From Swiss-Prot:
One of several proteins that assist in the late maturation steps of the functional core of the 30S ribosomal subunit. Associates with free 30S ribosomal subunits (but not with 30S subunits that are part of 70S ribosomes or polysomes). Required for efficient processing of 16S rRNA. May interact with the 5'-terminal helix region of 16S rRNA. SUPFAM superfamilies: Ribosome-binding factor A, RbfA. Belongs to the RbfA family. GO terms for biological process: maturation of SSU-rRNA. This is Ribosome-binding factor A. Monomer. Binds 30S ribosomal subunits, but not 50S ribosomal subunits or 70S ribosomes. One of its GO terms (cellular component) is cytosol. It is found in: Cytoplasm. Coiled coil: none annotated. The keyword Cytoplasm applies. One of its GO terms (molecular function) is ribosomal small subunit binding. It comes from the Bacteria. Keywords: Cytoplasm, Ribosome biogenesis.
Length: 122
């Protein structure tokens, strides 16, 4: 039987704090040229805080190269989180490129195309 947490939203708060700290660490301390302007979109932490999926988007540059660089720097970033977080364990970081913004732009283009073709028909 699973034990209920004494603080119900702790996982969300930890994920939010990891997101804020990673954003700062990547911007200020990570010197890899493959990592350009990165935005951390979301962080999902497992219930045991052993792993965290970090979803990011890139404004400029190659997403695959950036994902590879971030996954290679995961140990360095995790070490930085150890110094900032006041938790017993800091999760292992797994970076994934978030395609949500690309899909949203594609959907907006399709909607605009449908609206313009409908306006021509009227």
């Amino acid at each position: 039987m699973r034990k209920k947490s004494s603080t119900p939203n702790r996982g969300f708060r930890v994920a939010d704090q990891i997101q804020r700290d990673l954003t700062e660490l990547i911007a200020r301390e990570l010197k890899d040229p493959r990592v350009g302007m990165v935005t951390i979109q979301a962080v999902e932490v497992t219930p045991d805080y052993a792993h965290a999926k970090v979803f990011f988007s890139v404004l400029v540059g190659d997403p695959k190269a950036c994902e590879e660089a971030l996954n290679q720097a995961a140990g360095f970033l995790r070490n930085g989180l150890f110094k900032r977080l006041m938790t017993h364990t800091v999760p292992t970081l797994h970076f994934h490129f978030d395609r949500t913004t690309e899909r949203a732009a594609d959907m907006n283009a399709l909607i605009a195309k449908a609206v313009s073709s409908r306006a021509k028909d009227d």
